[in-house]
Amino acid sequence: ILLYKGVGMMWILGLLVFLPLLTAGLLFFIQGDRLRDAVVKVSAAAIAMLSLFVAFTYFGNKVVFRLGDSFLAQGAILVDILVALAVFYYTCVRFHRYWIALLEAIQLGAVLWFEYVSHGTLDYYADIVVDNFTLIMILIAGVIGSLIAVFSLGYMEAFQKEHRDVRDRRNFFFFVLFLFLSAMFGLVVSNNLLYMYTFWEITSVCSFLLIGYTESRVAVNNSFKALWMNLLGGAAFAAAIIVMGLTYHSTALSHLVGLALAGMPVTVILALLLLCGFTKSAMMPFSGWLLGAMVAPTPTSALLHSSTMVKAGVFLIIKLCPALGNNHAGTMAMFVGGITFFFASCAAISQSDGKKVLAYSTISNLGLIVCCA
């Protein structure tokens, strides 16, 4: 195990998170097709190459960073608030879905309260962990996500020509797409659940924005379905953080696994995190949001299915895998995954619509992964 406190590898990981974030900021203000194409292609190539470099350089070496109670923790709180403000804007100001805003307000209030009461009392075992599994996820997000971004250039241009009734918001589309990739990188390297929660919420909001891109009634309704289901998972995530932090004075995912292996009573925490993973990975009965996402442009479907959204859910569950033996949480994961695999497989073979076949087959494969975990 290589233990770092902020050198070398930390800068590379920071670049992996901030490069797509900076690209997103640029693309938000770019209206011209040529400049947008150039920025997307260069950034996608850089992200893919950086992902490959990280994977091949550090494969086989587990890297751990202890950041402690640093400015990054304060930054995570600020991001949580910004994400909540985005949710409040869409739910209260634009579309008047107040009960969804209430769900966001409850979990934000709970996390902020926990940050206040636990300040200075948490043991920071390892905030960032990069192992072989993390590197595989970095490759999936970095390489496949970059290919989707490049593919989106031509597709979205043709999409806007064929759908004159849809407002051309390609600058916003690519802004959200690269923000999505940035959040995914941050999520998979986070071992501190507080950091992971922040990136988790960003992916939820990004999926909501991408699904509702066309602004049609069906798209808006389906985007809100995805939002409230994932916010429900976010509330479970926040509850798990609070229970673990107040009980064991730690929010490290690896510490949670260690506690479970030592026979400590962590079933409630595991169950809450599994519920969070179920919503994100579209396990039944939460599979409706992924089916609804099919109304979005094809690059959105590709992004949600292959490199980001649903992979985040199974990533968390597989990370918890060593802790799921001989407890009710593991049994719950097995049954939910098995039931999802069976019924989604049956639904997939009965469909004639290509996108629905893709959605159900994705859900069934995810169910099999969860069941085996």
Regions found by a protein language model. Give the residues of each.
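Transmembrane helix-loop-helix hairpins at membrane boundaries of multipass inner-membrane proteins
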Residues: 3-15, 25-175, 250-261, 288, ...
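Generic enzyme active-site microenvironment
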Residues: 129, 199, 303
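Structural signature of hydrophobic alpha-helical transmembrane segments
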Residues: 9-19, 68-81, 132-143, 194-206, ...
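Hydrophobic transmembrane alpha-helices and their helix-loop junctions in integral membrane proteins
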Residues: 147-196, 206-373
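Hydrophobic membrane-targeting signal helices
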Residues: 18, 22, 26, 55, ...
